[in-house]
């Protein structure tokens, strides 16, 4: 999410809005949003309904979490682009921006992803911290 935080102004300049969805409880999501300084909305899907409906549910990790995914949805709700990824391979914002800026002819590349040490520490803290 940090990469998308860093690209948020470019995403907005392209006329798009960014919303993230987490299966974490609201208090955990609020803490993560503060810790990462996320300028975009972080919605909570604690019953995992949305992640199941969008086919990104991963029941094998931490009692069921969402796989990393990016969806570009038009204002008329048509899906322009989707990428459902693995933890170590994802589409980066720099590769999504051309889709937002043009008529959708670009297709982003996936990159190997290695979370930063601070990201690991925050994730572990969120797992062990109550509420």
Feature map (PLM): residue ranges:
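Chalcogenol-based redox active-site neighborhoods
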Residues: 1-131
